[in-house]
């Protein structure tokens, strides 16, 4: 897909704007909403956007920046998972620290928010401290969010410890939403002013894009991505009243603004410089858009992708019916159909043909991949391998101009692996999944030059689209993500077996 977004222009504009904001204060607490790293949603809806743009931005400012990571104790206790990586929030925190350090960015500390002695959280705290990570514990703020007099007092923010920082910009981030970032920023403002320092707060959140129309697919795609949070985009009424200008924000920020403004005014002892929640933001992503039509089409595709994802989550019992229905309503707003995702029909047609040939009324999983040149490649499940493995092999064979009749992996390699699964490990389904087939292919490549040529084509799948007629296992989904393939699934299980890796 062609670029519709200028990454370099955006980085320049964004870093300049943040530095302008920090000039007004001794210290700026910058709340980072959304994903700090691996923001694949932004990459999909803004072709040309780098998924680690925020990290690259911080690297440009690294002499002035240190990072505080917030983790909500309840998320650790219930093993909340980051969907795009399939890892828990505590593990994602460790990964985030490693990634920040790899860019020479200073990680100040981890703040455990709303801690109440949860056992799993205590273990996590011990793990961090024994690895030399500074940990601060914040308990629930008394009076929050409505009793401003109690919140801004020694009984409220004063009860939580002050985080010692040294740089002029303190980035406050988290593995996911509702982790206590805002509360941590305000807690710090309270302590800074108690110490006689002038500190400020700003918010850096990519979506919704404030200077893009309300019903633009880019902003609608944000609603599709947050159906579980029930976020609704809206015109910022405070911004309209103050400046007679239309700016887009979302319901939670708009609803929280009056109280947030009062808290800041109580802390600082003077009228807030912010006239609206949009004023608090420093987001300049809208200025990086160079082709609106490309952005619109990419955003529509993301809305369809999110509908499939929500459908699968509903099937698994992870979201309620209201969330699924809301996802459907968003599709209807833009008059989108599932078949507008080009790769869907070839996969379904392949599955239908397999069912017709088998003459059985049961699921016949199939997959399709759309290559960068628009070619559709399909794959089906068999005794040797599942549909995910088959479609990957078929795709790289096509890219390497290898005939269908040539086997990339010798039975001498395949059979021992299948025997290991069925006999030694006693796994009922001995068909190889996509990870196993790639390992088998790499072994074959050591002695088979044709397999080596095919293996080298895997990188060409980065950015391709894929669709499965059955819900993928978590492992298969992760392999496709690692290969850079955007994959969706129909909300149907591959078998009637209840013990399914989902």
UniProtKB/Swiss-Prot annotation:
Query: Where does the source fall among the domains of life?
Result: Bacteria
Q: Which Pfam families match?
A: DUF1846, DUF1846_C
- For this entry, the protein name equals UPF0371 protein Clos_2302
Organism equals Alkaliphilus oremlandii (strain OhILAs)
Q: Which family does it belong to?
A: Belongs to the UPF0371 family.
Q: What broad taxonomic lineage does this protein's source fall under?
A: Bacteria, Bacillati, Bacillota, Clostridia, Peptostreptococcales
| UniProt xrefs under Gene3D superfamilies | dip2346 domain like (3.10.630.10), Domain of unknown function (DUF1846), C-terminal subdomain (3.40.140.40)
Span-the-membrane segments of this chain are none
């Amino acid at each position: 897909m062609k670029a519709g977004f200028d990454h370099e222009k955006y980085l320049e504009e964004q870093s300049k704007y943040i530095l302008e904001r920090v000039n007004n204060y001794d210290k700026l607490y910058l709340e980072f909403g959304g994903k700090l790293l691996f923001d694949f949603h932004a990459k999909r809806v803004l072709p040309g956007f780098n998924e680690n743009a925020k990290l690259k931005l911080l690297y440009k400012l690294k002499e002035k920046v240190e990072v505080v990571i917030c983790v909500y104790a309840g998320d650790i206790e219930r093993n909340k998972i980051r969907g795009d990586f399939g890892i828990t929030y505590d593990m994602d925190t460790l990964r985030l620290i490693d990634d920040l350090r790899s860019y020479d960015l200073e990680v100040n500390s981890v703040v455990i928010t709303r801690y109440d002695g949860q056992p799993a959280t205590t273990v996590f705290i011990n793990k961090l401290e024994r690895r030399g990570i500074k940990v601060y514990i914040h308990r629930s703020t008394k009076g929050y969010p409505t009793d401003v007099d109690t919140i801004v007092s020694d009984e409220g923010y004063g009860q939580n410890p002050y985080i010692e920082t040294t740089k002029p910009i303190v980035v406050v981030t988290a593995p996911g939403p509702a982790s206590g970032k805002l509360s941590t920023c305000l807690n710090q403002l309270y302590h800074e002013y108690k110490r006689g320092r002038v500190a400020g707060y700003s918010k850096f959140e990519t979506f919704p894009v404030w200077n893009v129309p309300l019903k633009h697919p880019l902003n609608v795609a944000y609603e599709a991505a947050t159906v579980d949070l029930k976020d609704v985009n809206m015109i910022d009424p405070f911004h309209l009243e103050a400046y007679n200008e239309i700016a887009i924000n979302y319901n939670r920020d708009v609803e929280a603004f009056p109280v947030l403004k009062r808290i800041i005014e109580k802390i600082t002892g003077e009228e807030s410089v912010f006239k609206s929640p949009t004023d608090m933001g420093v987001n300049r992503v809208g200025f990086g858009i160079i082709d609106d039509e490309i952005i619109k089409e990419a955003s529509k595709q993301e809305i369809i992708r999110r509908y499939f994802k929500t459908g699968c989550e509903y099937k698994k019992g992870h979201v309620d019916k209201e969330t699924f229905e809301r996802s459907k309503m968003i599709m209807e707003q833009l008059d989108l159909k599932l078949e507008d995702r080009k790769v869907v029909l070839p996969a379904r047609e392949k599955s239908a043909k397999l069912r017709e040939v088998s003459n059985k009324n049961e699921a016949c999983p199939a997959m399709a991949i759309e290559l960068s040149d628009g070619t559709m490649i399909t794959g089906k499940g068999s005794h040797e391998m599942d549909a995910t493995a088959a479609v990957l092999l078929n795709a790289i064979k096509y890219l390497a101009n290898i005939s269908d009749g040539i086997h990339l992996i010798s039975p001498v390699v395949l059979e021992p692996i299948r025997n290991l699964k069925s006999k030694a490990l006693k796994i009922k389904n001995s068909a190889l999944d996509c990870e196993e087939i790639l390992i088998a292919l790499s072994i074959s490549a050591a002695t088979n030059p044709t397999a080596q040529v095919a293996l080298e084509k895997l990188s060409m799948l980065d950015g391709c689209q894929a669709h499965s007629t059955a819900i993928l296992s978590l492992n298969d989904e992760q392999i496709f993500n690692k290969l850079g393939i955007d994959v969706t699934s129909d909300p149907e299980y591959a078998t009637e077996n209840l013990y399914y890796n989902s």
